[in-house]
From Swiss-Prot:
It comes from the Bacteria. It comes from Fervidobacterium nodosum (strain ATCC 35602 / DSM 5306 / Rt17-B1). GO terms for biological process: tRNA methylation; tRNA wobble uridine modification. Keywords: Cytoplasm, FAD, Flavoprotein, Methyltransferase, NAD, NADP, Transferase, tRNA processing. The gene is trmFO. Its cofactor is FAD. This is Methylenetetrahydrofolate--tRNA-(uracil-5-)-methyltransferase TrmFO. Belongs to the MnmG family. TrmFO subfamily.
Amino acid sequence: MNKLVHIIGAGLAGSEAAWQLVKNGFNVVIHEMKRVKKSPVHVSENFAELVCSNSLKSTDLKNAEGLLKAEMEIWGSLILECAYNNSVPAGKALAVDREKFSQCVTEKLLQTGLVKVVWEEVEKPYTDDIWIIATGPTTDGKLAEWIREQTGGFFNFFDAVAPIVSAESINMDVCFVADRYGVGTGDYINCPMTKEEYERFWNELVNAQVIEIEDFDRKLLFERCQPIEEIARSGKDAMRYGPLRPVGIVDPKTGKEPYAVIQLRKENVEGTMYNIVGFQTRLKWGEQRRIIQLIPGLENAEILRYGVMHRNSYIDSPKVLDEYLRLKKMPNVFFAGQITGVEGYVESAMTGLYVGLNISRLILGKDMIKFPEKTMCGALVRYITTAPELKPMYANFGLLGGGKDREKIALKALDEMKKFYQITSLTIGG
């Protein structure tokens, strides 16, 4: 079998798949369009660009996201290696310096000498080699048309991106540094609100002008990236029980919890940029500036990046992909990333890892493998390939069945993955 593998898209899934292949000595051609045409959400030419947030979520094993990471580390995940090496303080969450993280992934892959980058917009797989389609949820153009022909169409949902402000424009006479419940190393800046300030903020937010998006449907909003204005419209106190909840945060000036609080998290290692946590939005840019400057401590905020919203698409994986994320009607084509129906940075990378591992085995004439179903990786892959009605899914303990002792479940899953790795891991290429 030809040892050359083509990957369309150098996002988290495509980059992770490439890493698993080059680790085993195989040549990879990455087809990336960003130098020719950028999607609405990308800004640089580096691989593995983070869009929605700079947080890869929890590292705690009692959290499903933490378990997912721990399992992937067993297989030598490039995404996690670069994430940990370029992390910024964020309590129990793994947050990264976006630019340095993407640069790390790019350099690691190119330094192998086995990766060739072709800057082009691919319309469809055009050789008989193995192809991985990892173009992400904003796939469009001729390639989207080709995928639609092969799969019967796309499902859609919408998500959004939060704004970033400059650190020097934050008024620390008003804001204060604290972590929820005192857990962490002072990783968040908090903007406290009184009841009057909150109510004014809410009133202005629900009446602010938004950017009209073609075919926008509130029913298609993804839960974890709900625009702040949509949360606000669902009820006057909805934000106080969501991203603006004050529970566990004490204002040192009053010794009490504020009525509401907006948190800011470091965006880069130097701490010169902060993103507004949970403030994904589709407000018009002028309105964003006006609303953000209503937040106590951000009266003179310099906005370095405005929030945006975009449509995400994914295929009907249970219908069109096999258990290895391979197109049933075209066995030389695999899919990876959010286009398969997973949701989240790390989940996306995991599918790339899975596909990269299995293509390595396929080229070597070995049987492909399925992660054990009682691992988080295995449960996620099983869900997206068997769900009766596929909805975007992120790591959660519900996928592993019942049981209240999450730590016990996680340790058992981790032990199972370690044993599976010892039995099935490849030792070629190094």
